[in-house]
Amino acid sequence: MTLAWELRKIGVPVTIHERKPSAGGSWWEPDLTKRDLHAHRILFDRGWVNTRSLLKDMDISWDALFERHTDGVFPYMFKKFKFQDYLALLTLPFVARRDRTLKDVLQGRMSPEGASIMEHLPLIIDGITWDVMSSYEMLESFNHVGLSRQWTQRVSGKVMGDLMYEALEKVGVEFKFNTSLDELLYISDEDNYVATFSDGTKLKDELLVLCVDHSPAIKLVGDNWGPGAKTMLNDTTYGCLNLLLDYPMGAPEMKDDLEIAATTPWKLQPRVLSDGKTLSCVICNLTDSILHTPPEALKQGVLEQLGVRAPETIRVGWGSTWDGERWQFHQSSGTLALTGQLPFFGRCSRVALCGMMSERRTPYASLEAAVEVGRQFAHENFGTPTPLETLKLSHIVILLLIVFVVLIIK
């Protein structure tokens, strides 16, 4: 939707084909009667400069959608960290690399308690554990959000999706809902393609931008981005299960989700939503055992590990379905690849890929990253303004060093 907004500002006609019945992306929720979300969210005000800018452009109030989140991971970290853990983290700027995982650079150098925290902290940041997250992503994530306050959703994701849809429709964006891209054939000798949608529409010649997450991208890239594209997407994609526990009289208070993730067998990430009645419990560490755990056993396991009273109902959030043997996922995301991201274009100049697999400055998968890559694509190919850049901790450090040097010289 970011890309559509940027292109309509310069008069480019845009049609969005959306497989869901309304707009919203991974923040989508089916209706306003009961919360049904793919995963709960954390936002960072000063770090999300492009998101705030886009919402302002669309005349959508940030405060109407989001509220301050007071819980934080630092109290639990400070309680558990030993002196050697702080020393290990101080070396991170010197050893962090894109091709080395966080586990590679920290394992064996921290106390057991400190290692456990750093193993599970990436789950809170980007839905992955330390053996998947690159040390670069961890360092840059702190750099990116270190000056920010945490926020979370005040209302259903449907509210934001509907407001963005209305803004886009006003400027002339055409939407085709309940429409999926069923087949994409690349015609290499013609530098063209044929795209077939579920409503029978066929496209060729026009610019087709695949604004998709990793799972559908795996099926759509073919060999257009080279032989390593599918491997990269497979290695960096991840999904989640979200169990929603309904407490009409008020959900129980929970400890910080980092502490619960570090102390439960399934690495659970629970959070009471803003309505105070819904406990959203995300499972990102999808082991083979969890993937083959039937719904009722999964619900019982979550209740036992959280140690909470029985809710009125337990539901599985949208995006995950049980096929009788295994959980299947219709929504996914992707972490930064250890080997680098994919370019917008492959061999075919008429088909582009724009999403979490694209090169981005925002290190963690998020709405901010999505807005950034949408703006970057529009800038590179249509001459629109570049994405905004976040004020980072490193910028402050550099500024202080410059001031220090100037004072010494004087």
Predicted regions and their residues:
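Conserved flavin/dinucleotide-binding core of flavoenzymes
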Residues: 263-399
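Active-site/ligand-binding neighborhood in enzyme catalytic cores
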Residues: 93-187
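Glycine-rich FAD pyrophosphate-binding loop
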Residues: 8-30
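Residues forming the flavin
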Residues: 153-166, 179-186, 190-194, 198, ...
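Single-pass alpha-helical membrane anchors
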Residues: 164, 397-410
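Mid-domain catalytic core of redox enzymes
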Residues: 182-291, 401
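Dinucleotide-binding Rossmann-like beta1-alpha1 core, especially the glycine-rich loop
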Residues: 33-104, 108, 112
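A short, Lys/Arg-enriched amphipathic alpha-helix followed by its capping loop at the start of a domain
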Residues: 2-12, 170-171
